A protein has these predicted regions:
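N-terminal signal peptide c-region/cleavage motif recognized by signal peptidases
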Residues: 15-17
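Residue-level marker for buried hydrophobic side chains located in beta-strands
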Residues: 85-87, 168-169, 195
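Metal-dependent amide/peptide-bond hydrolase catalytic core
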Residues: 21-25, 29-32, 40, 62-66, ...
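Acidic/His- and Gly-rich active-site-bordering loop/insert found
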Residues: 2-4, 19-112, 130-136, 327
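Short coil/turn motifs at secondary-structure junctions
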Residues: 92-94, 147-149, 195, 262-264
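Acidic/histidine-rich catalytic neighborhood of metal-dependent amide-processing enzymes
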Residues: 120-187, 227-228
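Short amphipathic alpha-helical segments
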Residues: 71, 105, 140, 251-256
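Structural motif corresponding to alpha-helix initiation and N-cap regions
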Residues: 69-70, 152, 312-313
């Protein structure tokens, strides 16, 4: 019978169950505190303050302003800011806020998986290693950023710390697998220009909504590049707006979309989409591309983990440096951003052990 590396890791970690039981209560309490703190993107202050209050017991804590009242949290044991290994994740979440709830092994709430599960497990792992004496000052530091869900402004601001690390362990819901690579991203806004009028006389107006629908239908049909590693490039139309009343020909309409790119040729994707829109509506529709990022390759040279490739984009490329880049965390991306976002207690516990292993192995390199 063939046993997966993840199963092997889980079996090996059963020997640590007594120790795990000693931190499970504090792990779950921290996770609950974080999920209960509404930290919707652009309004992350409750989570920032909750983290600061918690971390000040065992760490030196620095709050770094990103913009306005939005702040990143940087923490480290002792007085030395520099560390060989950094653990990081994001504290912002997508709307709407969903309150914390627990039933047995399952915990629900906004951010339970993406990514407050990673935050709680990372902190607990570092605390456990500090308590056992396996790591100390100068070995590890923690960084928790705002704005990951809105383009990565928090992680970009973290470059202002002026620090470098040998390895950075990024926390996202990966089902406790090490990620080998993740897709790129490309956003666009599309607008349609109509002429308002009475709905009973459509021949005297021009419906921006009709124009927008025609363009979007074409964009959804057009073939986009695929690769063996990442599969298909995908397009999601996330927002549509337009019109003022059902009996008025819509004067304007707009949409916003996100593309998960399987190729580095983002300019090629832009060309395909622009041509498709022009073929359907050569006038009155405008396509403007917004934020973008290339696919990212990651490190996965630590034994004992299953590995995977994921379709989402992360903060990984926003942090400058020559460090090794590991992406790992509890929870599933398939429930992230959904009304049923959840995580299990056992997944959180396994993540603590996984993070401990990643830290210790990184310190050996």
């Amino acid at each position: 019978m063939k046993i997966s590396r993840a199963t092997t890791l889980a079996i090996a970690l059963m020997g640590a169950s007594a120790w795990a039981a000693s931190y499970t209560e504090s792990l779950l309490a921290l996770h609950k505190t974080l999920v209960e703190a509404d930290s919707t993107t652009k309004a992350e202050a409750p989570s920032t303050q909750a983290l600061k209050t918690y971390l000040e017991t065992n760490f030196t804590v620095e709050l770094k302003t990103v913009e306005g009242s939005r702040q990143n949290v940087y923490a480290y044991p002792g007085s030395g800011r520099a560390a060989r290994v950094l653990l990081t994740s994001h504290i912002d979440t997508v709307p709407p806020y969903i309150p914390y709830s627990r039933a047995g092994d399952e915990i629900r709430g906004r951010g339970a998986s993406d990514a407050k599960g990673s935050v709680a497990a990372q902190i607990t792992a570092v605390e456990a290693l500090l308590a056992s004496g396996e790591v100390g000052e100068g070995d590890v530091a923690l960084l928790y950023v705002v704005g990951e869900e809105s383009g990565g402004e928090g992680m970009r601001a973290a470059n202002g710390l002026g620090l470098a690390w040998d390895a950075v362990i990024f926390g996202e819901p990966t089902e406790n697998s090490l990620v080998r690579a993740h897709k790129g991203v490309l956003g666009f806004n599309i607008t349609a220009d109509g002429v308002a009028g009475h709905s009973g006389y459509p021949e005297y107006g021009r419906s921006a909504i009709d124009l927008l629908i025609g363009a979007l239908e074409r964009l959804l049909d057009v073939p986009l590049p695929s690769t063996e590693e990442f599969g298909n490039t995908t397009l999601n139309i996330g927002v549509i707006e337009g019109g003022i009343a059902s009996n008025v020909i819509a004067e304007s309409a707009a949409g916003r979309a996100s593309i998960r790119a399987a190729t580095e040729d983002l300019e090629g994707i832009k060309g395909i989409l622009s041509k498709a829109v022009a073929e359907v509506t050569p006038e009155y529709v405008d396509l403007v591309f917004t934020g973008q990022g290339l696919p990212v390759s990651l490190d996965y040279d630590i034994e004992g983990f299953n590995t995977t490739v994921v379709n989402y984009y992360t903060d990984v490329p926003q942090l400058n440096g020559t460090h090794k880049r590991y992406l790992y965390g509890p929870g599933s991306i398939l429930v992230a951003h959904s009304a049923d976002e959840k995580i299990t207690v056992s997944d959180l516990e396994l993540a603590v052990e996984g993070y401990k292993k990643l830290i210790l192995e990184s310190l050996k390199k």
